[in-house]
Amino acid sequence: MDTQSYKTVSLKAGDIKKEWVVIDATDLVLGRLAARVALVLRGKNKPSFTPHMDCGDNVIILNADKVRLTGKKMTDKVYVRHTGYPGGQRFSTPKEIMAKKPTEVLRMAVKGMLPKNRLGAKLINNLYLYAGNEHPHQAQNPKTITLNEI
């Protein structure tokens, strides 16, 4: 029996092959989309996944403003943040956030599904969100994928 073939392979920084993928978020449910995007950013869809390395792909999401929330979450869900000052607790709904910055709700959803450490902070920088149908990353030759292909 050849024991060499049963060893777990761990990627090195030079072995990582990062790709660029485009996802159209029109009429996709926020949480389902965010979960799949976090999976691709992390690299868990690849057989060469290594937990401590940034081995995921760069993800471009178009039409991030057209993402859908089920039920009455657009007005009833509440995001809570704190300014750091006494009495500084602030509340906002997805509708209010999307009025100011259309891509922020999707960014917060994906960020919440990534690791809460330095790797997670690095991974969120591989996410590119655009409210419209255009993006400036044509030179990277991104491939278009749907949620079912992930």
Across the structure, where does each feature detected by a protein language model lie?
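Hydrophobic, well-ordered secondary-structure segments
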Residues: 106-107, 111, 124
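Short, highly charged C-terminal tails/helix-capping segments
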Residues: 129-137
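Ribosome large-subunit tunnel/peptidyl-transferase-proximal elements
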Residues: 1-108, 118, 136-150
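C-terminal structural segments of small proteins and small subunits
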Residues: 120-130
